[in-house]
């Protein structure tokens, strides 16, 4: 009898991993190797199957959760998790993909002239940095120039147009321009990605950071130090942010209906005029990144463009849910879904959150994976290395030798106080 129960239990688990019932969660971003799952299960010996039974079978709900277990296991076997690679190794393919068109076509002086109205024009001549006098957002330019100045002695003569607005410029299908932007809608834009200025300065200004979010190195230390152990975190999904669009409304309304699952409130932004702008409630106060760390589950939404908060959330060592979106920054493609973070949408969010609340060790494992990735690969040194490789390769696409525009401002390092 015991043997029969054992065999039945193992078969039940295999069914859990391999059979996707019609009633299973309708999540349309399955792993690339989703159809090769038989290979995954064949690698499991009996002890591993037994272990998974004891850990997961008591929570198993075949109509809802079989997909999640499969995607987690598939993500664990993904060879592109950047666990042993250098930071440049993780991100090099993004640079190569962004520049493949320009390496083939070449960048002409006319390309730069066409691009100038859409960003800030920089020149590097004889290892000196020059810029047009006007910069729409000075602290954003400062955040970019910090890294350029650190690299100036390594870089050849070149010039580029860097977009410092929140939104990208180029549109797929239109004439291309070699413009660099911090984020893009990957399904719509062709902008060349660069690390956001906010790694150093010029991020959004809120009460806790009145001059703008910056110094990611210092924030990393502070956030990590403030994070309580996993088993001391509150088992609620937490969100605070302004209503940049109606896309976030459903989570706010869910929080009001089910505060045991979600604590989500809107804060005030510059566009706020009345409580109508925060769905009938007074705006919540803004909070620090460190405060987020009290909670086991954090959720990220894109704003006007990609979210500045995203990379900070991982540092809490909490499980990060990311709303499905085609908006990316340079490091997003290196994050593996269901290994570093969990992709969600409005229709599957409650099911996925409930799954992880009842499978705590899986939640803790993914939270740890995401934290380790950000802590290892998003250092200021890694950002500087990305800039270096990007500009060195970009310079190879230039089909002419830039000439200094004499009216431009020479940018020099700021004196340390």
Segments and roles (model prediction):
Residues 11, 18-20, 157, 232, ...:
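Generic structural microfeature
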Residues 2-28:
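N-terminal signal-anchor transmembrane helix specifying type II single-pass membrane topology
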Residues 3-4, 9, 240, 254, ...:
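Generic structural signal for bulky hydrophobic/aromatic residues embedded
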Residues 3, 166-168, 234, 241-243, ...:
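Short, flexible loop/turn elements at secondary-structure junctions
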Residues 286-415:
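Catalytic binding pocket for nucleotide-activated donors in carbohydrate/polymer assembly enzymes
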Residues 1-3, 416-417:
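A positional/structural detector of protein chain ends, strongest at the extreme C-terminus
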Residues 23-288:
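Secretory-pathway glycan-assembly enzymes, especially type II membrane glycosyltransferases
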């Amino acid at each position: 009898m015991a043997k029969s129960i054992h065999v039945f239990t193992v078969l039940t688990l295999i069914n859990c991993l391999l059979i996707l019932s019609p009633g299973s969660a309708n999540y349309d971003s399955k792993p690339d190797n989703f159809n090769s799952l038989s290979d995954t299960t064949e690698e499991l010996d009996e002890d591993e199957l037994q272990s998974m039974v004891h850990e997961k079978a008591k929570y198993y709900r075949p109509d809802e959760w079989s997909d999640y277990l499969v995607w987690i296991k598939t993500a664990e076997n993904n060879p592109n998790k950047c666990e042993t690679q250098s930071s440049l190794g993780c991100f090099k393919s993004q640079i190569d993909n962004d520049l493949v068109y320009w390496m083939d076509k070449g960048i002409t002086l006319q390309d730069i002239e066409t691009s100038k109205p859409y960003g800030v024009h920089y020149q590097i001549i004889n290892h000196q940095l020059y810029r047009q006098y006007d910069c729409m957002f000075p602290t954003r330019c400062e955040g970019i120039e910090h890294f350029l100045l650190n690299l100036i002695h390594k870089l050849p003569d070149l010039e580029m147009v860097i977009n410092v607005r929140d939104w990208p410029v180029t549109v797929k299908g239109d004439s291309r321009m070699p413009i660099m932007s911090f984020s893009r809608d990957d399904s719509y834009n062709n902008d060349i990605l660069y690390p956001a200025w906010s790694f150093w300065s010029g991020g959004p200004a809120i009460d806790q950071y009145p001059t703008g979010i910056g110094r990611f190195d210092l924030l990393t230390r502070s956030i990590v130090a403030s994070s309580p152990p996993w088993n001391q975190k509150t088992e609620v999904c937490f969100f605070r942010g302004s209503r940049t669009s109606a896309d976030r409304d459903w989570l706010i309304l869910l929080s009001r209906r089910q505060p045991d699952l979600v604590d989500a409130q809107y804060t005030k932004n510059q566009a706020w005029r009345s409580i109508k702008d925060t769905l009938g409630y007074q705006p919540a106060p803004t909070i620090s990144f460190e405060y987020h760390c009290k909670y086991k589950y954090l959720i990220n939404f894109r704003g006007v463009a990609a979210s500045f908060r995203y990379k900070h959330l991982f540092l809490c060592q909490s499980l990060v849910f990311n709303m499905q979106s085609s908006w990316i920054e340079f490091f997003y493609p290196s994050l593996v879904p269901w290994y570093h973070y969990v992709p969600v949408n409005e229709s599957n969010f409650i099911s996925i959150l409930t799954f992880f609340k009842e499978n705590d060790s899986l939640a803790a494992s993914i939270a740890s994976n995401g934290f380790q990735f950000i802590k290892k690969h998003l250092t200021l040194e890694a950002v500087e290395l990305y800039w270096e490789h990007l500009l060195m390769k970009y310079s190879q696409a230039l089909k002419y030798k830039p000439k200094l525009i004499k009216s431009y401002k020479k940018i020099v390092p700021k004196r340390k106080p």
